[in-house]
Regions:
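Conserved ABC ATPase "signature" C-loop
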Residues: 240-241
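ABC ATPase NBD Q-loop/coupling interface
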Residues: 86-103
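Helix-to-loop junction immediately C-terminal to a conserved catalytic motif
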Residues: 77
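Catalytic Walker B motif of ABC-type/P-loop ATPase nucleotide-binding domains
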Residues: 187-190
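Conserved ABC ATPase "signature" region
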Residues: 140-158
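A short, flexible loop at the N-terminus of ABC-type nucleotide-binding domains that lies
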Residues: 16-28, 35-48, 97-100
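Conserved ABC ATPase signature
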Residues: 162-166, 170
Length: 300
């Protein structure tokens, strides 16, 4: 009898360990009580921040200026080192050694709001080649991968152009290709549509969609709630270095109180939908539309 009870307890412990392991590997990013303060500041940029991001999701990280979203991204990529707390990438704790940071940067690519900060090579082709060669690929493998990415992303027309001569939209496309050629698990984009016209915004959005089709987890920092509403699977709201809400996109987009705390407003498309339901023009039984195109289709 005692032996049977011991066996049952052992099995329960094993199952719990397996369940924990499965739940941990479900998350490509886990941040636990992360703190960061910039030198000379008394205010924490990150204040006991905790957050889990599941694999393959499109996640918008939002909040007012100084909320900590850009600092969090820099910590994820190893550019900044938290003063306390832990960050796990694909279940592995970030180690702030040369080898550990190299491993992190293989897994996580970051595209800054201003791509001029990360484009240094004389031509587009050389720029996209640089990262993969620097990571140790031989020239033949690198050339094949770069040609494939250039073709796939439609960059052939200006692959020999100097990067400094490109438009802002083209530079952002090259910066994305520069990371994508290395097959990251996570892509981080800081304000991907900032300062772009409609044409280049559309192209950048198409590139982001290709990332998610490849199973890459995509995180963006943005102030644009309309953009996030139409694009993201989930939204993370931040304020004063903390995560104040993390949920599926439509939950967040209808949570007026949480949005207000994050210095945001309910998307105008949802406000319009509410007015139309109040006037009985549309039914309130459906989930609100994410985009103006979706709203228009319901009216036709």
């Amino acid at each position: 009898m005692m032996d049977k009870m011991k066996d049952m307890k052992t099995k329960k412990r094993t199952l719990k360990k397996e369940e924990k392991k499965e739940s941990e590997t479900e998350y490509v990013i886990r941040a636990e009580n992360v703190d960061y303060t910039y030198e000379g500041s008394k205010i924490k940029a990150l204040d006991h921040l905790s957050l889990n991001i599941r694999k393959g999701k499109k996640v918008a990280v939002m909040g007012g200026n100084g909320c900590g979203k850009s600092t969090f991204f820099l910590c994820l990529n190893g550019i900044r080192r938290p003063e306390s707390g832990r960050i796990f990438i694909d279940g592995k704790l970030i180690e702030y050694t040369k080898k550990g940071l190299l491993d992190v940067r293989r897994k996580i690519g970051i595209v800054f709001q201003n791509p001029d900060e990360q484009l240094f090579s004389s031509s587009v082709y050389e720029e996209i080649s640089f990262g993969i060669l620097n990571m140790g690929a031989d020239e033949e493998t690198a050339e094949k991968a770069v040609r494939q990415i250039i073709e796939e992303l439609g960059l052939s027309a200006f692959q020999e152009e100097p990067t400094h001569a490109l438009s802002g939209g083209q530079k952002k496309q090259v910066a994305i290709a520069d990371i994508l050629v290395m097959h990251p698990e996570v892509m981080i984009l800081d304000e991907p549509a900032a300062a772009l016209d409609m044409k280049h915004t559309k192209k950048v959005n198409e590139m982001i969609e290709r990332l998610t089709e490849k199973g890459i987890t995509v995180l963006i920092a943005t102030h644009d709630i309309e953009y996030a509403c139409g694009w993201a699977d989930e939204i993370v709201l931040m304020h004063e270095g903390k995560v104040i809400r993390h949920a599926e996109t439509m939950e967040i987009c209808q949570d007026e109180e949480a949005l207000k705390e994050a210095e945001l407003e309910i998307p105008t498309v949802i406000r319009m939908y509410r007015k139309l339901t109040e006037k009985k023009i549309l039914s309130d039984k459906e989930e609100p539309p994410r985009t103006w195109e979706e709203l228009e289709s319901r009216l036709t």
